[in-house]
Swiss-Prot record:
Forms oxaloacetate, a four-carbon dicarboxylic acid source for the tricarboxylic acid cycle. This is Phosphoenolpyruvate carboxylase. Coiled coil: none annotated. Its EC number is 4.1.1.31. GO terms for biological process: carbon fixation; oxaloacetate metabolic process; tricarboxylic acid cycle. GO terms for cellular component: cytosol. The lineage of its organism: Bacteria, Pseudomonadati, Pseudomonadota, Betaproteobacteria, Burkholderiales. It catalyses: oxaloacetate + phosphate = phosphoenolpyruvate + hydrogencarbonate. It comes from Ralstonia nicotianae (strain ATCC BAA-1114 / GMI1000). The active site is at residues 193, 634. The keyword Lyase applies. It comes from the Bacteria.
Length: 985
């Protein structure tokens, strides 16, 4: 079974051509002006053997793209600009290689002599090269997967087939697998946090470069190769002549369009393809009796979510109107896609009743069509699809106000629900299947039917989110104006609960129709009304979840239930109106360390509320809880954040199992490790036992969306790993229950306590640390950059008032990445381990504790993933580069005190990590990632050096320091460094 499944998976791969490798004397020169050329013949290369041989095609692509960029740089800016870029690159390499102080002085002199225009050109060159290198790397990942498949290699970790084979090897039955899918729900949720640093125009150009680069892996004639190079040169030129930065801050509508572009390039086709492949693999690995190997359709367990247009936490520009606009644009995108696919099917399904029979239902569907052309009298499939198109066009007009791109043949009634459209397509599918047309049904038609199951008329569910303080203020005003309670906010928690529960049972509303409420209260009420409106218009799946940021008490949840009641979305179950129920699930978001620790108690109180069991029943006996990785990290540090999340998840699982309620966890993961980032596959597999249970939602944030989903093939792989990991974590949970788990957890608790102390002492208790952070990172410049529609800080960032506590976690992490310390991803671990070992006393006891840590690394996925992510962060960090940022702090005493502590902790962390893993080199167990990161340094480091120089100029206060070109240079460097690190916030 295993071999046949692997063979069939291999047969689906695209063949690649073999070409001779480049001469061994050619060494990679990953620079914007790399002069080492590469043959312009077909670059389809099947490599085997050494890592260097496997990476040869990647090196060739990087050299090739670097040469094109160098040519464009010479052409557009002159030879002198090209030589300047090369000199800076070579000097930065010397500085990196051995911390060469002479190289540092040369860099200082060189960078200071650059004019503002020269600086901008140099920054742009290195930034664009980082983007081009990322494209080459993505293409190489795709290439290597095809090579593995062609070679008949075993399925790769993270693949669906590997997950299914593992489940089969563990003795899982086909029935158990099907029960898993029946109850499963997996939802990636796109968000629009202010880490999206790339313009859509740049992304579009990069997609075309990626397509052309992939084209070079196919057999091309000489003329085709020449044309390919010409087009690539044109698009690189287009990049150079396209403004990289936005001149104005993004509006929410822009963020909506950016997100929708990923549906058009990736999700609409790749998600149905993912289902198809999964169904085929299930049929192969778990064949059903009498099914003859035919795939059985799976339920629509994998869907998409979005915060864009519904996330009001800290963003005053998200209103009821933006929610309506987001829903309308989503419907427009999916309906337009359906219309195009139906039109294409009409051209494809040309079967004639003179040659083949059709079903009675298909004939009836054709008869209902407004198409009565005699030319198509014997083509019922075409007539039926013309009718479907007409109804869908009417639906599009009704839901979006837009006409279909192609006019319908005649009038037809609109579909009221997506299920009606799906039923019509099923008639077509069944008729084809019954009359020797299975192959026709299995192509575009089957994918379209699956898309309707997944996307409906809404495309993606939009979550609503707001901070709990706003809800409290809104409810307080409603109660005061209604004469119910004049000082709600001053009540004790117990009194708030009593009042809110009483109001939820009252049939009357608090809202007065002719009263003018405050702007905030009116806006909040409008959001709830808009939610009810779009649910009625586009279907209930358009808005299903309401996230409450900073949930600290049970009343925070009850307030949102009351606001739903005011909008007609809560049924209290009295007066014969049926059982209680919420239209939109109320979901707490626990963010800080203290909130995480209180989460089990709050959820226990919620589940114990009188009558809440009826609400749960209406929700399918499920309740979701969201966990915040970002704020917990900023609050308590990397190690403590991860450990508190782990403990909270276990406590919630135990609570929900005891209550007989299904728990679904929503992971608010960011792009950086400090915000829960890192490889999704390992992150899901390392979740505590029993916490996944077939259901998971997780955020996909910032420009991480671009790196994961801009390339359709990369996007498909990322979607696949989410499903595979969820399947494995649910069906093979014993892998995360190693022997000695209690001992491991006790050790983690001790480490967490020590790490928490070290982190809090540095960040919140060190005098002047706030000033050091603002001086040595580009945090204020990031706040000024037009990254997203949401402000970077919850409060104005003036020097006297600003506090670390008030800074959002996203720019906090973004800033540490820019200065190459990436502190939120590692600080505190080294001293925590050292202190725990020292507490053991004797050398023998210390050795025993170190042995425990080694076993934890080898046997416990949670700890192994934690160390793996930290290893990756440390490999991207650079103390030499960071030391140059430290010089931006003018207070010498403060600078030396803080940076010396950070440096010492960094060195100690590297040492203890090596002692635990047995690896002296960073990423020794992941050489592909190690080489990838190493390849970026020659163009990443110069951007950091340039950024430091630009920050010096900008902050100097000298004449011209606030020049627009200096500001633009800083912003360009931020963009390029984020691209080079392949994550931002």
């Amino acid at each position: 079974m295993t071999q046949s499944a692997a063979r069939r998976a291999s047969s689906r791969a695209t063949p690649a051509r073999k070409t001779p490798p480049a001469p061994a004397s050619q060494t990679p020169a990953p620079s914007p002006g790399g002069t080492a050329g590469t043959a312009l013949g077909p670059t389809s290369r099947r490599s085997s053997g050494s890592a260097a041989a496997k990476d040869q095609p990647l090196k060739e692509d990087i050299r090739f793209l670097g040469r094109l960029l160098g040519d464009v740089l010479r052409e557009q800016e002159g030879a002198a600009a090209f030589e300047t870029v090369e000199t800076i690159r070579q000097t930065a390499v010397r500085f990196r290689r051995d911390g060469d102080r002479q190289a540092e002085q040369e860099l200082d002199r060189l960078l200071k002599t650059l004019s503002r225009d020269q600086t901008t050109s140099v920054v742009r060159a290195f930034s664009y090269f980082s983007h081009l290198a990322n494209i080459a790397e993505d293409q190489h990942h795709n290439r290597r997967r095809r090579v593995h498949a062609l070679a008949g290699s075993s399925p790769q970790p993270g693949s669906l087939l590997r997950a299914l084979l593992s489940a089969a090897d563990e003795g899982l039955s086909g029935d158990a697998l099907r029960r898993f899918f029946d109850a499963a729900l997996i939802v990636p949720v796109l968000t629009a946090h202010p880490t999206e640093v790339q313009r859509k125009s740049i992304l579009d150009a990069q997609r075309e470069i990626a397509r052309l680069l992939a084209e070079r892996d196919a057999p091309l004639t000489v003329r085709e190769r020449e044309r390919n190079v010409t087009l690539l040169r044109a698009h690189v030129t287009k990049l150079w002549q396209t403004r990289m930065l936005r001149t104005t801050r993004l509006m929410v509508a822009d963020e909506i369009e950016n997100a929708l572009s990923y549906y058009q390039t990736t999700f609409l086709r790749e998600i149905p393809a993912l289902y198809r492949e999964l169904e085929e693999d299930v049929a192969t690995v778990f064949p059903r009796r009498g099914a003859r190997g035919e795939p059985a359709p799976l339920p629509a367990f994998f869907q998409m979510g979005s915060w864009i247009g519904g996330d009001r936490d800290g963003n005053p520009f998200v209103t009821a109107q933006t929610l309506r606009h987001a829903a309308q644009r989503q419907a427009s995108v999916i309906l337009t896609w359906y219309l195009d696919e139906i039109h294409a099917l009409g051209a494809e399904l040309s079967m004639s009743t003179l040659l083949v029979d059709v079903s009675a239902d298909l004939l009836a569907l054709a008869e209902r069509s407004p198409d009565h052309s005699e030319h198509r009298a014997d083509e019922p499939y075409r007539r039926a699809l013309i009718g479907v198109y007409a109804r869908l066009a009417a639906t599009c007009r009704e839901l979006t106000g837009e006409d279909a791109g192609r006019h319908a043949v005649g009038p037809a009634p609109a579909y009221t629900r997506a299920e009606e459209l799906r039923a019509d397509l099923q008639i077509v599918i069944d008729s084809l299947a019954a009359h020797h047309g299975e192959a026709l049904a299995d192509a575009r038609l089957a994918s379209l039917a699956r898309a309707i199951d997944v996307f409906g008329f809404h495309l993606a569910s939009i979550d609503l989110r707001q901070v709990s303080d706003v809800h409290e203020a809104t409810v307080a005003e409603l109660l005061r104006v209604a004469g119910v309670e004049g000082a709600y906010a001053a009540l004790s928690e117990a009194d708030k609960r009593t009042l809110l529960l009483r109001e939820l049972q009252q049939p009357r509303l608090l809202t007065l129709p002719f009263h003018t409420y405050s702007e905030t209260t009116a806006s909040e009420l409008d959001i709830f009304r808009a939610a009810r409106e779009v649910r009625a218009r586009y279907g209930s799946r358009i808005v299903r979840n309401y996230i409450i940021s900073h949930t600290e008490t049970l009343s925070d949840l009850l307030e949102v239930m009351l606001l739903q009641k005011e909008a007609g979305m809560f049924r209290h179950g009295t007066n014969g109106s049926g059982g209680a129920g919420l239209d939109v699930m109320v979901i707490p978001l626990f963010e800080t360390i203290e909130d995480l620790r209180n989460a089990p108690q709050i959820m226990g109180e919620l589940l114990a509320l009188p009558g809440f069991d009826a609400v749960l029943a209406a929700q399918g006996n499920e309740q979701e809880v969201m966990l915040g990785y970002s704020d917990s990290n900023k609050d308590g540090g990397f190690l403590t954040s991860n450990w508190e999340l782990y403990k909270t998840e276990l406590a919630l699982v135990e609570l929900f199992e005891r209550k007989g309620v299904r728990l679904r966890l929503f992971h608010g993961r960011g792009g950086t490790v400090g915000r829960g980032g890192g490889p999704t596959y390992q992150a899901i597999l390392s979740q505590p036992p029993g916490t996944v249970n077939g259901q998971i939602r997780l955020t996909e944030q910032g420009e991480i969306i671009s790196s994961k989903f801009a390339n359709p093939e990369i996007g498909r792989r990322n979607l696949e790993t989410i499903v595979a990991a969820t399947l494995e974590a649910t069906l093979l949970p014993t892998r995360n229950r190693p022997k000695g788990l209690e001992e491991f957890e006790a050790a983690m608790q001790a480490l967490s306590d020590h790490a928490f102390s070290a982190y809090r002492h540095l960040v919140y208790e060190t005098p002047g640390f706030k000033d050091y952070f603002f001086a040595t990172t580009p945090i204020t410049e990031i706040a000024d950059l037009n990254l997203g529609s949401r402000p970077a800080s919850r409060k104005l960032m003036d020097r006297k008032q600003r506090r670390i506590e008030d800074l959002r976690a996203i720019p906090w992490g973004f800033s540490w990445g820019q200065c190459r310390l990436l502190l939120p991803g590692w600080f505190g671990f080294g001293s925590a381990v050292q202190r725990w070992l020292d507490e053991a006393g004797s050398a023998k006891a210390k050795a025993a504790r170190l042995a425990t840590l080694k076993r934890m690394h080898k046997q416990w996925p949670f700890f192994a993933n934690l160390l793996s992510n930290m290893d990756m962060v440390l490999s991207k960090a650079d103390l030499n580069v960071a030391s140059r940022y430290a010089q931006l702090c003018e207070d010498r005493k403060l600078r030396n005190a803080v940076f010396s502590r950070i440096s010492a902790e960094f060195t100690l962390t590297e040492q203890v990590l090596g002692a635990i893993t047995g690896q002296s080199e960073r990423l020794a167990d992941n050489p592909l990632l190690a080489r990838s990161i190493k390849n970026r340094f020659p163009y990443l480091d110069p951007l950091n050096h340039l950024q430091v120089e630009l920050l010096k100029r900008f902050r100097s206060g000298k004449a011209g320091s606030n020049d627009a070109r200096v500001r633009r240079g800083i912003h360009l460097s931020i963009n390029g460094i984020a691209a080079g690190l392949r994550n931002s916030g």
